[in-house]
From Swiss-Prot:
GO terms of molecular function: DNA binding; excinuclease ABC activity
GO BP: any one term: SOS response
Domain (GIY-YIG): residue spans on this chain: 15-92
Similarity comment text for this entry: Belongs to the UvrC family.
UVR domain span: 197-232
Keyword check for DNA damage: yes
Organism encoding this protein: Oenococcus oeni (strain ATCC BAA-331 / PSU-1)
Disulfide bonds: none
UniProt-listed PROSITE patterns: GIY_YIG (PS50164), UVR (PS50151), UVRC (PS50165)
Descriptive protein name: UvrABC system protein C
């Protein structure tokens, strides 16, 4: 049931297009949507029954805001802008790899054919993307043999090896006329646009001439080129006599989840496919339209000449915002491909459900055991902290993030503590919690469902104090270890030790989180200690000032690497020959001394 505040705001909603932003109890935006009629759309969240992720969204809405726009198109574009800005938890979060390769004809006096990972504004001509590096490399190799441009590094006064093999036009030893380059560039362009007839005809003629001249090895080479075209181009054709670059989107939805399948059609072929499975927080139509809009707003996204979508999608609105034709095929090959994409999406989603059933007990089920023990709402994201120091110096903290029971290492963070703490765990905790959640608050990012502190009551209460000062409400618990430094108890905010069955998945997850945050902070502390030790040892060498010390640390990183470097390598950093020689001799002596100590220690341990 909607709160009094929400009921009052619902009554004020206009019947106009716009974007709406749902907020949680901390005032953070958790969902952004668009509407042709704000009044009808926003009211639907609170005046109807919902299931799945939509029900979870509504349960977390404590307030909302809206922005009226002049048109549906403006609302669509505004929604996309706000999603990118706030990254709301309940909106689709795209996972593009951006790693598909392209073939580029470079914009140079003597052009080359190269593989490119991204599209650049360098006036080169790009073809692709290709499904993988192997496919792109094979095509590139075929073109280099059939329609050579430049493969060498440029003029060197003599023909290069590639020229003698017929794979370079000779920029290595002569000025190649632009007409020669253009002839082959035109042929390459035709081939990569799917016009293979001319290439097949040319190669067949060359193969016949080679065979008639009894150059059977050369004839076999031409035969292999024909086989390449047949296997990689013609046999993969799914649209006959249609070379228009198209992207095709379809979906399958079940149990509050949706899988989106994308087919990339180039030169009449299904070049590659991409799929993504998402929990629905809105209608399928709204989610799919939002996904497509976000898809083409990503960095390096290449728009095709046309986009194909299933029925009930607002093709007119998408076409206006994407500024390319968007349509729904109703018959023929394109309609068949749309059905094929839906079939693939269904298989993907059904496979996901089977995997979810297998993994739920170990992941989300384990998280639920922990939240149930703490008597807090079930969540999907835990953040854990630990500290490390050397007798009060080099004090560091580290954060690990577990989502749905699994570590998300992209979200891990390391902190050098700024305030003097000595060995005061409370001060260290207060600082790192303040820094972490001030940033999340200021950037409008999603808070975790639970904070776990490695330690006991000191760390727990200090974390709670920091959150109270920030006026942020996040549950906190502590992971307590026994005298054998093993996970023993879960401590709640009231200082109570909560029992978790040591054989349960929840206890096992707690162990993994505690071990992971400890590993991460210790690794960081060792790196920092090594760096500090290196810095102090370099300070012992006469003639090495702060600037030279920093250069040596950045370039080599450790004493053994400096000892292995030549005097010339050290001089290359802008250090004079006399000081460079002194550095080499001094550091070599230090390393030799350290090695003797290590050998003596090992010998002692063996005895």
């Amino acid at each position: 049931m909607a709160s009094e505040l929400i009921e009052q705001k619902l009554a004020l909603l206009p019947s106009q297009p716009g974007s709406y932003q749902m907020k949680d109890k901390n005032g953070k935006i958790i969902y952004v949507g668009k509407a042709k009629n704000l009044k009808n759309r926003v009211r639907s969240y609170f005046k109807a029954e919902h299931t799945g992720k939509t029900a979870e969204l509504v349960a977390n809405i404590h307030d909302f805001e809206f922005i009226v726009t002049n048109s549906d198109k403006e609302a669509f574009l505004l929604e996309n802008t706000l999603i990118k800005r706030y990254r709301p938890y309940f909106n689709i979060r795209l996972k593009f790899s951006g790693s598909y390769p392209y073939i580029e004809i470079t914009n140079e006096r003597d052009p080359r054919l190269i593989l490119a990972n991204t599209l650049k504004h360098d006036h080169g001509t790009y073809f692709g993307p290709y499904p993988n590096v192997y496919a792109a490399s094979e095509t590139l190799h075929f073109l280099e043999m059939t329609y050579p441009l430049r493969r060498c590094n440029g003029y060197q006064g003599r023909p290069c090896l590639y020229y003698s093999m017929g794979q370079c036009l000779g920029a290595c030893w002569r000025t190649v006329p632009q007409e020669e380059y253009q002839k082959n560039i035109d042929a390459i362009t035709r081939f990569l646009n799917g016009e293979t007839g001319k290439a097949i005809s040319d190669i067949k003629k060359k193969m016949k001439r080679a065979s008639d001249s009894t150059e059977y090895e050369l004839a076999a080479d031409f035969r292999d080129r024909l086989k390449f075209i047949d296997q990689t181009v013609e046999s993969q054709r799914v649209l006959q006599n249609d070379h228009t670059p198209r992207d095709l989107f379809n979906f399958y939805m079940d149990k509050g989840w949706m899988t989106i399948e994308i087919f990339f059609l180039r030169q009449g072929r299904l070049l590659r496919q991409q799929k993504e499975t998402l929990a629905l927080a809105d209608s399928v139509k709204e989610e799919l339209e939002s996904y497509i809009q976000q898809f083409y707003s990503q960095k390096n996204a290449q728009k095709p000449k046309e986009v194909l979508v299933p029925k009930n999608v607002d093709t007119k609105l998408l076409a206006e915002t994407l500024e390319i034709p968007v349509r729904t095929p109703v018959r023929g090959e394109k309609r068949d491909l749309l059905k094929l994409a839906a079939k693939n999406a269904r298989i993907t989603l059904e496979d996901k459900f089977r995997l979810m059933e297998l993994n739920e007990e170990k992941t989300t089920g384990a998280m639920k055991e922990i939240t149930d023990a703490l008597k807090i709402p079930h969540g999907y994201r835990f953040e854990a902290f630990d500290h490390s120091n050397t007798q009060g110096s080099n004090y560091v903290s580290a954060l690990v993030v577990f989502e749905d029971g699994l570590p998300n290492k992209n979200l891990y963070r390391r902190y050098k503590l700024r305030t003097p703490t000595g060995q005061d765990e409370a001060k260290a905790t207060f600082e790192v919690i303040t820094r972490r959640y001030t940033r999340l608050r200021d950037e409008g990012q999603m808070y975790p469902d639970l904070i776990l502190m490695d330690g006991g009551e000191i760390q727990l209460h200090s974390a709670e104090a920091a959150l109270r000062k920030l006026d942020i409400d996040i549950p906190v618990a502590a992971m307590v270890k026994n005298d054998k430094h093993q996970t023993a108890d879960l401590l709640n905010s009231r200082g109570e030790n909560l029992f978790l069955d040591p054989h349960s998945q929840g206890f096992y997850l707690l162990q993994r989180i505690q071990d992971e945050v400890h590993r991460f902070v210790i690794t960081f502390h060792r790196q920092l200690r090594t760096k500090t030790n290196l810095s102090s040892r370099l300070d012992e060498i006469a003639g090495i000032g702060p600037k030279s010390r920093v250069k040596l640390m950045r370039r080599f990183g450790s004493l053994p690497k400096i000892a292995d470097a030549s005097i010339e390598d050290i001089e290359a950093l802008g250090i004079g020959e006399k000081v460079a020689t002194l550095v080499k001799v001094s550091v070599s002596a230090m390393v030799k001394s350290e090695n003797k100590k290590i050998i003596a220690k090992r010998k002692f341990e063996k005895e």
